[in-house]
Amino acid sequence: MKTLYSLRRFYPVETLFNGTLALAGRDQETTGFAWWAGNARLINLSGKLLGAHVAHAGLIVFWAGAMNLFEVAHFVPEKPMYEQGLILLPHLATLGWGVGPGGEVIDTFPYFVSGVLHLISSAVLGFGGIYHALLGPETLEESFPFFGYVWKDRNKMTTILGIHLILLGIGAFLLVLKALYFGGVYDTWAPGGGDVRKITNLTLSPSVIFGYLLKSPFGGEGWIVSVDDLEDIIGGHVWLGSICIVGGIWHILTKPFAWARRALVWSGEAYLSYSLGALSVFGFIACCFVWFNNTAYPSEFYGPTGPEASQAQAFTFLVRDQRLGANVGSAQGPTGLGKYLMRSPTGEVIFGGETMRFWDLRAPWLEPLRGPNGLDLSRLKKDIQPWQERRSAEYMTHAPLGSLNSVGGVATEINAVNYVSPRSWLATSHFVLGFFLFVGHLWHAGRARAAAAGFEKGIDRDFEPVLSMTPLN
């Protein structure tokens, strides 16, 4: 079962580096890969590959638990989360754990529980990983045919795909259940400055949910990143979970159609490239989502978005100068446009100055001051509440910008708060990881296609240039 076909046919890339180091029969000679090629040695050893994946999951979950407890240990309830360099607690707070009105943390115990549960889970996964890597069967096909597979078995591969889709669908429904029945989630739009609430009136209309996918990605539209109410987010998860589960069942019950059998490459490396491509897309979408969206990523926990900080500064100075007697409705700025307020090309009243580029920002502290034609002058003169002033002054000084030059007019003098926004971290890290995953997708897709076409030869190791060079020492 292990050697259904010539290893040289499917691994023609010669990778001799240190052929003498043998690891439990998984050496260069038997696999075509040297020790440093990592899991490539395990391509046809389903049991050992399972061990590697379970151990990897254990490392991931261990990091989550340890980092979670580290953040709990360092957490100062009197300071905003986004001032403390936290990247995990904001996610737990967004799910409604431990927070009250205005995003104030009232109980850190749920965060502690989360960390401990992840640590315990990681121990179980770590044990399973070590067991399958060292003690379990090398291949699962003989003893546990349900869990065994051969990479070119198209029907088995789509069955595995189906199982994964069902698990993803269940994950989507876990969020739905939390929002509907288990305490609700944090809603930054709740009246008075945000609160935890149960989401009862879900948006299930397909025209609304799928309308997001048909929107333009540009300003004022913003594709799915423009979602700004939790009913749509949770309703979207109902749709997504249902599609994943139905699609998973379909993939388990069916075999690939002829066009799919012809169009796709059916090898382990090809599946790796497909997965990396998908993860890359997820990374780029997540980057835009965390950078621009303050509903799924509330500013109370992640800090303001870039546009939000810029608009908050314009609002703060409008409030100040209006108190000092300025007529904010008619004051002219240095360019001849309105200094505080101006009209957009389509006629709405928007903030003037450099922040005009962020005219389409929506934020809970600003929306009450809008009327049917944009910002309402009479509300700006009579209805501004103290909490809106405090919130905007706080956001103005916590822009997620570092020290960029083009910052939408935000004052970034060097005496500002020593501060890196978690929004910056999360957006940047997901962009960078998305890019690396995309490069990995191209690399493995190219190798998989070349191997399938039969012309991947690799370097001729007998006459490799480095062999004739003098040693470095």
Curated annotation (Swiss-Prot):
UniProt-annotated binding residues for [CaMn4O5] cluster: E367
GO-annotated biological processes: photosynthetic electron transport in photosystem II
Cell compartment(s), UniProt: Plastid, Chloroplast thylakoid membrane
Membrane topology: Multi-pass membrane protein
Keyword DNA repair: no
Phosphothreonine PTM positions: T15
Pfam family, one: PSII
Molecular-function GO terms, alphabetical: chlorophyll binding; electron transporter, transferring electrons within the cyclic electron transport pathway of photosynthesis activity; metal ion binding
TM segment ranges: 69-93, 134-155, 178-200, 255-275, 291-312, 447-471
Cofactor note: Binds multiple chlorophylls and provides some of the ligands for the Ca-4Mn-5O cluster of the oxygen-evolving complex. It may also provide a ligand for a Cl- that is required for oxygen evolution. PSII binds additional chlorophylls, carotenoids and specific lipids.
Propeptide feature ranges: 1-14
Modified residues (N-acetylthreonine): T15
GO CC annotations on file: chloroplast thylakoid membrane; photosystem II
Keywords: Acetylation, Chlorophyll, Chloroplast, Chromophore, Manganese, Membrane, Metal-binding, Phosphoprotein, Photosynthesis, Photosystem II, Plastid, Thylakoid, Transmembrane, Transmembrane helix
Keyword Chloroplast appears in the UniProt entry: yes
Function: One of the components of the core complex of photosystem II (PSII). It binds chlorophyll and helps catalyze the primary light-induced photochemical processes of PSII. PSII is a light-driven water:plastoquinone oxidoreductase, using light energy to abstract electrons from H(2)O, generating O(2) and a proton gradient subsequently used for ATP formation.
Oligomeric and partner information: PSII is composed of 1 copy each of membrane proteins PsbA, PsbB, PsbC, PsbD, PsbE, PsbF, PsbH, PsbI, PsbJ, PsbK, PsbL, PsbM, PsbT, PsbX, PsbY, PsbZ, Psb30/Ycf12, at least 3 peripheral proteins of the oxygen-evolving complex and a large number of cofactors. It forms dimeric complexes.
Membership in a protein family: Belongs to the PsbB/PsbC family. PsbC subfamily.
HAMAP family xref list: PSII_PsbC_CP43
Protein name from the UniProt record: Photosystem II CP43 reaction center protein
Source organism (scientific name): Buxus microphylla (Littleleaf boxwood)
